[in-house]
Amino acid sequence: PVLLKASAGGGGRGIRRCDRPEDLSAAFAEAKAEAQACFGNDEMYLEKLVLRPRHIEFQVLADRYGNVIHLGDRDCSVQRRNQKLIEEAPARCLTPELRERMGAAAVKAAKAVGYENAGTVEFLLDPDREHFYFMEMNTRIQVEHGVTELVTGVDLVRQQLRIASGLALRLRQEDVTLQGHAIECRINAEDPVQGFRPCPGRVDFLHFPGGPGVRVDSCLYSGCELSPYYDSMAAKILAYAPTRMETIRRMRRCLEEFTLEGFPTNAELSYQILYHPEFILGECTTAFLDEHLSELLEFSRKLSESGVDA
């Protein structure tokens, strides 16, 4: 199988999987039209489709003087429609040796193109955890940058501004250490039961979680209107703790405390994912939601019918 992808793509748009040669022409036409409509650019490229991979990415910083470092990895395998839903750092599935190899590859890629900025080098890691494949580089600060900030203590936005101002990196690779574990849940205005249909609207009531090891990035407030003309993401809830299991428990508590009235969100689905054995063991691949969505939604439905509120 192969994957058709929009050169200017993002957010899971302009992507088509193709398993049979006879389907390639139609899939190409569909993806090309979607790319033109979404990005104003219909250029496409073709790549090998890695089945059941993990989505592992490395944060890099590069200045104009040739200094390039990475700030560790993130596991972004829990996705819907090729768009990330839950991200964490560091990736539980990586051995120290594999982390070193992938980090070195990310730095080498950035150096090869003379990159200057904060950026993310994204890889697909195959199921046997022996081979990894370059997927793309995001030449910007990403949604999930916060989990890297929490485990490294490095302010990525500040570093990006310093680089843009022409200043040399003060950090060296040996200065970067990963401490603890961080998880981010994206809160999207969408209905998972209706195929993740966007559900913009007015925020009638809003309460975000708080406390030690909790970070919320959002511009929402009670009474505001979430526009239908932009991405459905409404907030990011991040949790940090010394161990991964402590972080999972803290994020569960965050989602129990989070309240938004006015339109549906994916918060309940993310809460169920945090209890799933595959997630707890750190075994999720990009196929996780495709394989388990129905059971996760069914459990949520039974809770709702029984009057139990997560």
Regions found by a protein language model. Name each.
Residues P1-L3:
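Acidic/histidine-enriched active-site and ligand-binding environments that engage anionic O-linkages
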Residues A6, G11, C18-A310:
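ATP-dependent carboxylate activation and anion-phosphoryl transfer catalytic cores
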